[in-house]
Amino acid sequence: MRVAIVGAGLAGLAAAIDLVDAGHQVAIYDSRPFVGGKVGSWIDADGNHIEMGLHVFFFNYANLFALMRKVGAFENLLPKAHTHTFINKGGEVGELDFRFPIGAPFNGLKAFFTTSQLTWLDKLQNALALGTSPLVRGILDYEGAMKIIRALDRISFADWFRSHGGSEGSLKRMWNPIAYALGFIDTENISARCMLTVFQMFAAKTEASKLNLLAGSPAEYLHKPILDYIQARGATLHLRRRVREIEYTETNGQTVVTGLQIADGDAVERVEADVYLAACDVPGIQRLLPEAWRKWSEFDNIYKLDAVPVATVQLRFDGWVTELGDREKRHQLDHATGLDNLLYTADADFSCFTDLALSSPKDYYRKGQGSLLQCVLTPGDPFIAMKNEDIAQHVLKQVHELFPSSRDLNMTWSNVVKLAQSLYREAPGMDPFRPDQKTPIANFFLAGSYTQQDYIDSMEGATISGRRAAKAMLEAQAIAA
């Protein structure tokens, strides 16, 4: 079976792995000059590794981790301490510390009751909200709890949390930074289904909330092993190749895709396959689908989905920003030092950040240089129209507010990557509009983390969607045979 995949992000790559494993001929096309989609990275003219965003690998990414083990990339993950660290103004540190001799859900209870990020009243109200949630049922009946959680898509997490006795302090100081990190929108605008799904996964498995970062850039330490794997099994990759048009015929009420018109420089190439997979993000699939296909609700509903803007900022320093205690350590450049983990904050426009020179040193640590902070500005709306230099200075000012001791360090380099449309907006009531991977057209399938799957728009969600699409294609082929 010949398969043409449009989109070389994780969804398309995950589908390609299962398809080449089944012995099929796979060709992947992407308009960008690099693979990975929203997880993409590249090297600029000065040798700096630039990322589309900050990519964190939780231990509950079961499908992605299985993929990484298969292609030999799993050893490229660097596990971090099992804590979620919050940086508050003035360098005050709060933590959700999940390290506990007894596993889930008791390690989570310990983390919430011992955190300094919340007042005792907030902790009690937080316990009330979570204690009356489907998470309790999920300890014994995971699927039963998930059925309840899926039905909560219609309301925001903030509204659900308040209705169960949760406090404004918890929303502002803890849950908003986490919501921004997960979906790039706050708790007033993110679906309760989205947040509670993640909490359910964390509550069910002890290690689920523990995170990893890659040893270096996604291009080298995630995508290269995947490409090596699929290309060794006959897959081909075609970059800078934008699909201009989907060709199709309609006969006796049956629609069949017959080919793709794909740009090749100034020319256009016609590509034929037996089966086609559109592994795109929300704006990509909205541009790709023929207008006539909106007669089907499965396709028309896609246009009800929206994507959120984000800006990712990298700042290089001549010392170690997150080294809070020792001035001499902060200024030495012999080795990396500081907080080696993902960091959250409720006191800046970037909800989460890390020092890549410390947490992903293979590509980001440079001898004789210091921290490389990577900060994710969410919501990104106010920053899309701003000049990159102004954004960098804005972030630098907020870094100084979080880490006053960093004021005696110099910023030596900066970079800004803006995405006007990134993750799909997981707003209340949007879940019914997400399409299945199987479509009304027998030889045309969808993938991408906006498509139906329980996880959020994430690397794990993309992987699940790609694997579900590959399974649907293989089942369709078996039926046809």
Swiss-Prot record:
Catalytic activity: 9,9'-di-cis-zeta-carotene + 2 a quinone = 7,7',9,9'-tetra-cis-lycopene + 2 a quinol
Pathways involved: Carotenoid biosynthesis; lycopene biosynthesis
Enzyme kind, highest EC tier: oxidoreductase
UniProt cross-references to Pfam families, sorted A to Z: Amino_oxidase (PF01593)
InterPro entries: Amino_oxidase, FAD/NAD-bd_sf, Zeta_caro_desat, Zeta_carotene_desat/Oxidored
GO molecular function: 9,9'-di-cis-zeta-carotene desaturase activity
EC number: 1.3.5.6
Top-rank taxon: Bacteria
Cofactor binding remark: Lipophilic quinones such as decyl-plastoquinone or decyl-ubiquinone.
Record keyword Transport present: no
Cofactor: decylplastoquinone; 6-decylubiquinone
Entry annotated with the keyword Ribonucleoprotein: no
GO terms classed as biological process: carotenoid biosynthetic process
UniProt cross-references to PANTHER family, sorted A to Z: PROTOPORPHYRINOGEN OXIDASE, ZETA-CAROTENE DESATURASE, CHLOROPLASTIC_CHROMOPLASTIC
Entry's family note: Belongs to the zeta carotene desaturase family.
Function: Catalyzes the conversion of zeta-carotene to lycopene via the intermediary of neurosporene.
Protein's name in the database: Probable zeta-carotene desaturase
